[in-house]
Amino acid sequence: MSAAIQFTRGIDEPVVPDVRLTRSRDGQNGTATFYFDEPQALVGEVRQDITGMYLLDDEGELATREVKAKFINGQPAGLEAVYLMRSPEEWDRFMRFMQRYAEANGLGFTEA
């Protein structure tokens, strides 16, 4: 396994999200906000129960239950998930996951 994101355990989400990172000045806290445009978890042929967002890689699993769906004209349009990091160690672990996920999906990293 390299790295994958799931909303239902066992089912990888193929849609690659837009990810925005913020970090406190002292480096103790951070937030990663993921936005998925028309994810398969919402618009696929078989809709699944979304139980959270699970970030899986060779080191294990990171998870958040803070997942919100966006609807436009009554139709599912996207998912937003927020992952909180409360220590420099959690930040480093998250960044290792993102490095693996970026490599697996041909993504790059840009600083704002």
UniProtKB/Swiss-Prot annotation:
<keyword id="KW-0604">Photosystem II</keyword>
<comment type="similarity">
    <text>Belongs to the Psb28 family.</text>
</comment>
<dbReference type="GO" id="GO:0031676">
    <property type="term" value="C:plasma membrane-derived thylakoid membrane"/>
</dbReference>
<dbReference type="InterPro" id="IPR005610">
    <property type="entry name" value="PSII_Psb28_class-1"/>
</dbReference>
<protein>
    <recommendedName>
        <fullName>Photosystem II reaction center Psb28 protein</fullName>
    </recommendedName>
</protein>
<keyword id="KW-0602">Photosynthesis</keyword>
<keyword id="KW-0472">Membrane</keyword>
<comment type="subunit">
    <text>Part of the photosystem II complex.</text>
</comment>
<dbReference type="Pfam" id="PF03912">
    <property type="entry name" value="Psb28"/>
</dbReference>
<dbReference type="InterPro" id="IPR038676">
    <property type="entry name" value="Psb28_c1_sf"/>
</dbReference>
<dbReference type="GO" id="GO:0015979">
    <property type="term" value="P:photosynthesis"/>
</dbReference>
<keyword id="KW-0793">Thylakoid</keyword>
<dbReference type="GO" id="GO:0009654">
    <property type="term" value="C:photosystem II oxygen evolving complex"/>
</dbReference>
